[in-house]
């Protein structure tokens, strides 16, 4: 009976400890289109107080920097590099022995893309590192997977239909 009680107590403690492990950074990902061939992949993170998310292109000896990996880009091409947006903090970090750039409270990373075919399929992931003054999370990632008809091609077909309607009306007049 004592072994069962001890095992049960250890199990309860493990569950409670796991429940207390908060996720200090929560990212959302979206593909923002504007009806043209150009669009943006936007990753927006909410960062808990006391934590920060590192920016892009920090160098090899630094912390885990934000980076984008695109595994599927059928009908869509990346344009340029992943770009940080928002209030970036530049600060010397004793742990890394270098000046690092990071975000507190919110972080936004944007990758420009261009649709190249009528149908597209995109799968990508943002990898990032986050730390507090006491600890760092292991590298984390947020994924985005989208497929469908490119907005620019939908708009172009709509314009062709409008022009055909106008030509028909002109012929009838």
Regions found by a protein language model. Name each.
Residues 18-173:
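Extracellular/lumen-exposed scaffold segments
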Residues 10-18:
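Hydrophobic h-region of N-terminal signal peptides that target proteins for export
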Residues 1-2, 21:
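N-terminal hydrophobic targeting signals that begin at the initiator methionine
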């Amino acid at each position: 009976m004592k072994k069962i009680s001890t095992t049960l107590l250890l199990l309860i403690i493990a569950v409670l400890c796991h429940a207390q492990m908060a996720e200090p950074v929560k990212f959302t990902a979206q593909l923002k289109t504007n009806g043209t061939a150009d669009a943006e992949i936007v990753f927006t993170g909410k960062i808990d107080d006391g934590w920060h998310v590192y920016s892009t292109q920090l160098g090899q000896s630094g912390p885990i920097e934000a980076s984008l990996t695109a595994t599927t880009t059928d009908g869509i091409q990346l344009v340029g590099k992943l770009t940080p947006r928002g209030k970036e903090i530049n600060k010397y970090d004793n742990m890394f022995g270098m000046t690092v750039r990071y975000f507190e409270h919110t972080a936004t990373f944007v990758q420009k893309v261009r649709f190249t075919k009528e149908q597209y399929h995109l799968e990508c992931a943002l990898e990032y590192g986050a730390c507090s003054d006491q600890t760092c999370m292991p590298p984390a990632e947020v994924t985005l997977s989208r497929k469908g008809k490119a907005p620019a091609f939908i708009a172009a077909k709509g314009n062709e239909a409008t022009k055909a309607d106008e030509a028909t009306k002109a012929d009838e007049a």
